[in-house]
């Protein structure tokens, strides 16, 4: 089950809660994609509700989305300074902290709609700190945390895969991250005994597909690249992934 906040509205919240709880009861994989969680209080409150009521096997988002989740676990009433979007629908105010949320030092969230804030970008210079923060959040939430961007991080709180696959054009394709969350869910469901490795493989796969799409589309533009990306995902196999995956474990 992949719970995605991308097209969130009031009516979808009970459905996501019920689906998540039932998936937990049945022992099915549940993944959270907190799309644009830092963009409005409505999205933040919904994410808080889901984190409190549903046990997630993995959470995948860009760095700003993950940092916002971390700030929610740290201080429930904390607001982002970049909350430029306001949803008109209200949700019931949450007054109880989730048992698995606690103060996470050094992590604060900002957002730019569904895009990562440039100031949050994971770079070689700040990589060690981001790895530390990601591991801390993973331990607090007791779930795999996958942070995707120019450098991808996938951690279970103990080990962290640092993945360097991908192409800058992927950031110009709306829905590429959501596509990855679907792939991640499928990989986890197929490999329930090796969830960290499965999550890392999913992220590597999407990055490899992005590289192959860039080779195929050349300078044709983002429309051609989008189609080439979907083609590359559909044509991916184990051999291509093994040859193309670039990662280290820290």
Regions found by a protein language model. Give the residues of each.
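Conserved phosphate/ATP/ADP-binding segment of small-molecule kinases
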Residues: 42-160
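Short pre-catalytic strand/loop immediately N-terminal to key active-site residues, enriched for Gly-Thr
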Residues: 163-175
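Short, small-residue alpha-helix embedded
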Residues: 68, 174-204
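Short, well-structured alpha-helical segments that form the helix of a local strand-helix-strand
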Residues: 133-138, 195-210, 229-230
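Glycine/small-residue-rich loop that forms an oxyanion/phosphate-binding "nest" at active or ligand-binding sites
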Residues: 12-61
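Short, structured active-site "lid" loops
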Residues: 1-11
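Structural motif
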Residues: 1-2, 28-31, 56-59, 143-146, ...
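Charged C-terminal helix
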Residues: 208-250
């Amino acid at each position: 089950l992949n719970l995605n906040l991308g097209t969130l509205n009031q009516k979808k919240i009970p459905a996501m809660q019920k689906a998540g709880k039932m998936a937990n009861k049945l022992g099915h994989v549940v993944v959270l994609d907190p799309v644009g969680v830092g963009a409005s209080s409505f999205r933040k409150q919904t994410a808080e509700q889901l984190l409190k009521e549903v046990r997630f096997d993995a959470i995948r988002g860009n760095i700003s989305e993950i940092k916002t989740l971390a700030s929610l676990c740290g201080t429930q009433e904390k607001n982002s300074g970049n909350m430029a979007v306001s949803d008109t629908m209200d949700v019931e105010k949450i007054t109880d902290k989730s048992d698995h949320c606690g103060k996470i030092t050094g992590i604060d969230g900002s957002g730019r709609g569904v895009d990562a804030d440039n100031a949050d970008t994971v770079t070689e210079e700040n990589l060690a700190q981001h790895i530390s923060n990601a591991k801390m959040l993973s331990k607090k939430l007791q779930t795999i945390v996958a942070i995707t961007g120019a450098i991808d991080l996938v951690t279970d709180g103990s080990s962290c895969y640092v993945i360097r696959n991908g192409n800058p054009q992927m950031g110009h394709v709306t829905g590429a991250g959501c596509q990855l969350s679907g792939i991640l869910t499928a990989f986890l469901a197929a490999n329930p005994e090796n969830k960290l490795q499965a999550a890392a493989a999913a992220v590597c796969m999407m990055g490899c597909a992005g590289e192959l799409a860039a080779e195929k589309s050349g300078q044709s533009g983002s429309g051609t690249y989008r189609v080439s990306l979907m083609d590359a995902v559909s044509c991916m196999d184990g051999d291509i992934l093994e040859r193309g995956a670039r990662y280290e474990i820290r």
